[in-house]
C-alpha cells in the first residue's frame, strides 16, 4: 500500500498516523524499525505523525509511567516538541479538551467531571459549538510540521452516557467558519504540508460525522466542498 501512487506522502515519504502515542510502548523503536524496513524496500522512509491532544493533563515519565499535570492552555509547544523529540515527524493535534477548558475555565471543567462521577444523575454538559471552536486551535498549529484537525460536531453520550458533553449549534454554517480558520493556519505552509485531518467521517457513536443525515442532509459535506473549492 505504501508504494501505491495514490498514497499520501510528505517529503516523498508515506504518511503514517499513530493514535494515542502516549500509550504506545516502545514507539521510538517501532518507528526506527519501520523506517529501516521501508528503506530496505525502496522507500525514502516513513513520515510518522503523532495524533495527540493539544493540551493534556498527563505526562509520561522517563520510566514510561504516566503522571497527572495541570494543563497549559497558552501554548502547545511542550507537547508537540515532546513527540518530535521522540522521533515523530509531524503532529496531528486534537483541540477539543483545550477548547472546552478555555470556554468553561479549566478548574470548573475538572470540578464538573469530578461532580459527575460523584452524582451520576447530573445532566450531560452542553457546549456551544461556535463559542467553543474559537479556542480549538493553538498558536503552534501553524507550524509546518503540524497538521490541524477539522471537528464538525460531537455527542458521545450514546457511548459514555452523561459523562461526556454535547455540542449544540453544530451546524454546517458554523462548521464552515471552523474550516476557514483551519485553512488560514495552513495557507502559508509548504504545498506537501497543507494537510488537514477530518475527525470524523462516520463516527456515529460519538455524534462526530459529516455523512448525510436526516437533519442536515449533505450540509456538512457541502460545507467542506464550499471551502475547498475557494
Predicted regions and their residues:
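Extracellular/periplasmic catalytic domains that process cell-envelope and extracellular macromolecules
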Residues: 1-2, 8-11, 84-85, 139-142, ...
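Active-site groove signature of glycoside hydrolases
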Residues: 1-24, 194-203
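Residue-level recognition of the N-termini of beta-strands and the immediately preceding loop/turn
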Residues: 14, 45-47, 146, 193-196
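Aromatic-lined glycan-binding groove of carbohydrate-active enzymes
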Residues: 26-27, 31-172
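Alpha-helical scaffolding segments of alpha/beta enzyme cores, especially the outer helices
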Residues: 29-36, 177, 181-184, 219-226
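Conserved structural scaffold segments of CAZyme catalytic domains across common CAZy folds
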Residues: 143-146, 195, 223-224, 228
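Substrate-binding cleft of secreted/luminal carbohydrate-active enzymes
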Residues: 171-212
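Aromatic-rich peripheral "rim/lid" segments of glycoside hydrolase catalytic domains that contact
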Residues: 199, 207-230
Amino acid at each position: 500500500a505504501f508504494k501505491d501512487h495514490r498514497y499520501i506522502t510528505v517529503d516523498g515519504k508515506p504518511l503514517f498516523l499513530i493514535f494515542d502515542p502516549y500509550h504506545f510502548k516502545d514507539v521510538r523503536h517501532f518507528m526506527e524499525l519501520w523506517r529501516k524496513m521501508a528503506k530496505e524496500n525502496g522507500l525514502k522512509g516513513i513520515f510518522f505523525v503523532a495524533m495527540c491532544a493539544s493540551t493534556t493533563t498527563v505526562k509520561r515519565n522517563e520510566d514510561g509511567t504516566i503522571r497527572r499535570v495541570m494543563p497549559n492552555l497558552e501554548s502547545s509547544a511542550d507537547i508537540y516538541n515532546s513527540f518530535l523529540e521522540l522521533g515523530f515527524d509531524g503532529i496531528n493535534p486534537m483541540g477539543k479538551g483545550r477548547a472546552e477548558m478555555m470556554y468553561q475555565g479549566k478548574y470548573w471543567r475538572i470540578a464538573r467531571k469530578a461532580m459527575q462521577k460523584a452524582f451520576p444523575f447530573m445532566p450531560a454538559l452542553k457546549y456551544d459549538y461556535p463559542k467553543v471552536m474559537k479556542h480549538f486551535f493553538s498558536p503552534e498549529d501553524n507550524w509546518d510540521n503540524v497538521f490541524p484537525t477539522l471537528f464538525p460536531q460531537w455527542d458521545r453520550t450514546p457511548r459514555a452516557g452523561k459523562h461526556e458533553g454535547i455540542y449544540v449549534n453544530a451546524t454546517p454554517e458554523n462548521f464552515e467558519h471552523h474550516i476557514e480558520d483551519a485553512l488560514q493556519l495552513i495557507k502559508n505552509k509548504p504545498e506537501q504540508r497543507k494537510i488537514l485531518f477530518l475527525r470524523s467521517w462516520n463516527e456515529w457513536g460519538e455524534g462526530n460525522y459529516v455523512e448525510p443525515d436526516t437533519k442536515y442532509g449533505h450540509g456538512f459535506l457541502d460545507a467542506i466542498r464550499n471551502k475547498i473549492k475557494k
